[in-house]
A protein has these predicted regions:
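Flexible loop residues that form catalytic
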Residues: 10, 67, 163
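Conserved acidic, metal-coordinating active-site core of Asp-based
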Residues: 95, 99, 106-184
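Active-site phosphate-binding/coordination module
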Residues: 22-127
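Short, Lys/Arg-enriched, disordered terminal segments
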Residues: 1-2, 33
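Asp-based phosphoryl-transfer active-site loop
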Residues: 2-18, 92
Length: 184
């Protein structure tokens, strides 16, 4: 008997326009009605989970931040976390400030980004639905490194976006000394 179904969201359950079909919703509802745990699994933070998914009756848990956290959706509390310690995250942000890219940190189910870099990321050659999602779902900070110092929370995930493969490669070279402790 099937006990659990894990579902990737973007590009799988949701199409490239970030929409879910009625057919997919019905299949998810049917599985949940049969007592099967339906578990969305995504790179998104808790706050970035699509409303259309959360409104489907019978979904009680979600794997978020690429496995950085598992949430009980009824209580909105993390029941598991595998975080990057705050000090390490601050070091990485400091190092990555030298590249032309968007650095994001996910803390307690929310994604934070530096305002100036978020604005610049809108010029990257990415799909319009993706850019809209990023713009709408990020909490903007004047200075991400200072925010990490003030917040003190551990980081469920770090996400990087670049406008060019050259900058991406530069960033990977800069964080190479940290890779033993990270999933890159």
């Amino acid at each position: 008997k099937i006990k659990m179904i894990g579902l990737d969201l973007d590009g799988t359950v949701f199409n490239d326009n970030k929409e879910i079909s009625e057919e997919n919703k019905a299949a998810i509802r049917e599985a949940a009605a049969q007592g099967i745990i339906v578990l969305p699994a995504t790179g998104r933070p808790l706050r970035g989970l699509p409303k259309a998914m959360l409104e489907i009756e019978g979904i009680h848990y979600a794997v978020t931040s690429n496995g950085g956290a598992v949430y009980d959706l009824d209580s909105r509390k993390a029941i598991y976390e595998d975080c990057i310690p705050n000090e390490e995250a601050k070091q990485l942000v400091s190092v990555l400030n030298a590249v032309d890219g968007l650095v994001e940190v996910y803390i307690d189910g929310v994604c934070y980004a530096q305002q100036s870099r978020l604005e610049h990321a809108l010029t990257y050659p990415l799909s319009k639905p993706f850019l809209e999602y990023i713009w709408k779902s990020r909490e903007r900070q004047e200075d991400l490194e200072a925010f990490l110092t003030a917040d003190g929370g551990n980081v469920q995930k770090m996400h990087l976006l670049f406008g060019s493969t050259k900058e991406r490669q530069r960033a990977f070279e800069m964080i190479a000394p940290y890779e033993a402790d990270l999933a890159v």
